[in-house]
């Protein structure tokens, strides 16, 4: 008898962990299949979570009751708020993570998760029912020829589809060092007529920290009283460690340039496109030829692990070149190299093949998440996995509901919209600059933006829903008080505030918005607020400082939502729309946007083309 589940998630990386737990939370009987349980939660590249844009995604995952933020807080050994000197909208929390502790925490979480079964099995194929109008994926088959049936399947294969690693001319099949590759799933994806491409990523060598000379290197400490990723952080902060900063130099660059012909990236050996914002050191020397130095951040991999990750010198150069290059860097003259850096090529699916739910347009019941969608990064993968898992569960449970987020809801909405309307020609990485409504999409208010949506979708548990409701009530009460209470200029002056003596009374919220006014100042003037929660006070301070800008951005969002409200029928025939060139028709047919707003964001689409679509759709509805 076939093993039957509501949802099957293939892969135990960051996307798979979030997809499996999200599907289980939403009420689906869920199976996570991974080739090795001991590798669940593995951090394959850098030992860090968060950063600019990425920290926002972790907070959004947490707001939807995902697991990454809580697991990161259990394993964080250094916290830093990036862009601390800038506005709240562009600040990003980043943490160095103890790899072993993170992996252990994630495995413990998943192996005891309600509604979730975890089994070992290398998935080699999809079970496809082609009897209907559209193919439907109804299960998977493992290498051991064990079949599993499900109403929804979520693929989170990471770099494992036809994974090929490069160190100089040496090639090794695998999705990660000392790991296997999945050789047959791509064939099933192509059988479903999904467009498959090739991308590349890379990682630096790993170093023995005991053999590094830190004496002349710049120390980079973490923050003493750090913020945490999770709104639910209730675990003690671990002992915190320092990173160190060194740099390449002209000798390093001379070694690399003398061996550039041996670099797989430039010899024609690698065909996949790498991430623009995380280039290899050999790529940096080509793109920034005028620079004679690049920073190298020495990041510890754990509290009881001497391994160090040299962030900034990712490479696939031959081992002898890596050896000479690394030993030319200050502090690393006598370092022992534990293992060399490498590049990895892998298959991905053109993300314009997906709906906003992350289900494929050409096959029912098949959802894709993570690097398989053309992204790079743990945080991007985790966020996509969560949304795919929720929608896979909603479909399997036949709820007739979908869980989607748009560009005004969160960074996850921005990322999905970018992927499904623009596609990718290089691995996609999240930045705050990608979000046009970033003043409203701050990391501090991720729960206020998203948790209720998660409650409505069914993916937020009772404990978090209750905590969110309590915080929202406290926030609404304090905000209402600040907006209702007023003080005259004379009263404010007597309280120590510097104000214009125009006679105009000011609300508490307006006073809080004054430059250099702190929450402590407000409490002195309005003692009723003395017992306000710290997280509520922080959010009100930010709202007050930004209130003029926020009102303008809310007006922009209203206009955006108007375009998003106009749905384009799935079966629309773009060839019948007058005035569209063959090229524009081809672009529309490739993406098949779900809304007028999405149509306007497709690369190469003119306002005139959008107007033509609008007129045609309106006529269809008459």
Identify the meaning behind each predicted range.
Residues 127-146:
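Conserved beta-strand-loop-beta-strand element in the redox core of flavoprotein oxidoreductases
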């Amino acid at each position: 008898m076939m093993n039957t589940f509501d949802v099957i998630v293939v892969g135990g990386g960051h996307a798979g962990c979030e997809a499996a737990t999200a599907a289980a939370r939403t009420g689906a009987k869920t199976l996570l299949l991974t080739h090795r349980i001991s590798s669940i939660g593995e951090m394959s590249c850098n030992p860090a979570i968060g950063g600019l844009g990425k920290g926002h995604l972790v907070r959004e995952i947490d707001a939807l009751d995902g697991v990454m933020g809580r697991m990161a807080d259990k394993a964080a050994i250094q916290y830093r708020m990036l862009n601390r000197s800038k506005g709240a909208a562009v600040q990003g929390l980043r943490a160095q993570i103890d790899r072993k502790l993170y992996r252990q925490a994630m495995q413990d979480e998943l192996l005891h998760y309600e509604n979730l079964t975890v089994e070992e099995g290398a998935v080699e194929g999809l079970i496809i029912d082609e009897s209907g109008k559209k193919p439907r994926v109804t299960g998977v088959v493992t290498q051991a020829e064990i079949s599993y049936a499900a109403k929804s399947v979520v693929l989170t294969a990471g770099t494992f589809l036809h994974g090929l690693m490069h160190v100089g001319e040496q090639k090794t099949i695998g999705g990660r060092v000392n790991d296997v590759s999945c050789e047959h799933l791509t064939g099933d994806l192509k059988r479903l007529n999904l467009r498959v491409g090739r991308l590349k990523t890379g990682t630096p060598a790993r170093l023995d920290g005991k053999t590094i000379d830190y004496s002349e290197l710049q120390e980079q400490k973490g923050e003493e009283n750090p913020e945490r990723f999770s709104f639910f952080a209730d675990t003690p902060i671990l002992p915190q460690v320092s990173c160190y900063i060194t740099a390449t130099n002209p000798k390093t660059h001379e070694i690399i340039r003398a061996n550039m012909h041996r670099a797989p990236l430039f010899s024609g050996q690698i065909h996949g496109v790498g991430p623009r914002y995380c280039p290899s050191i050999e790529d940096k020397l080509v793109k920034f030829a005028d620079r004679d130095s690049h920073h190298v951040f020495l990041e510890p991999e754990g509290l009881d692990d001497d391994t160090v990750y040299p962030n900034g010198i990712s490479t696939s150069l031959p081992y002898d070149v890596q050896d000479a290059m690394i030993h030319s860097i200050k502090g690393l003259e006598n370092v022992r190299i534990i293992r060399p850096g490498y590049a990895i090529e892998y298959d991905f699916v053109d993300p314009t093949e997906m709906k906003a739910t992350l289900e494929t347009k050409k096959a029912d019941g098949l959802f894709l998440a993570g690097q398989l969608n053309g992204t790079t990064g743990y945080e991007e993968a985790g966020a996509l996995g969560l949304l795919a898992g929720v929608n896979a569960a909603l479909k399997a449970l036949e709820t007739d509901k979908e869980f989607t987020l748009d560009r005004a809801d969160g960074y996850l909405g921005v990322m999905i919209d970018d992927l499904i309307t623009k596609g990718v020609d290089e691995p996609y990485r999240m930045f705050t600059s990608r979000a046009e409504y970033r003043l409203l999409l701050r990391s501090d208010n991720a729960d206020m933006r998203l948790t209720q949506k998660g409650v409505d979708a069914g993916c937020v548990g009772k404990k978090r829903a209750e905590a969110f409701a309590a915080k929202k009530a406290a926030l609404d009460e304090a905000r209402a008080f600040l907006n209702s209470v007023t003080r005259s200029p004379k009263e404010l002056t007597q309280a120590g505030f510097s104000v214009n003596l125009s006679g105009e009374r000011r609300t508490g919220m307006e006073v809080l918005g004054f430059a250099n006014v702190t929450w402590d100042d407000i409490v002195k003037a309005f003692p009723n607020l003395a017992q306000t929660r710290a997280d509520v006070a922080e959010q009100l301070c930010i709202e007050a400082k930004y209130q003029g800008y926020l009102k303008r951005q809310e007006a922009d969002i209203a206009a955006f939502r108007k375009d998003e409200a106009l749905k384009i029928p799935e079966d629309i025939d773009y060839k019948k729309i007058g005035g569209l060139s063959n090229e524009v028709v081809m672009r529309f047919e490739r993406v098949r946007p779900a809304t007028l707003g999405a149509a306007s964001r497709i690369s190469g689409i003119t306002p005139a083309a959008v107007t033509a679509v609008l007129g045609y759709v309106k006529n269809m509805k008459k």
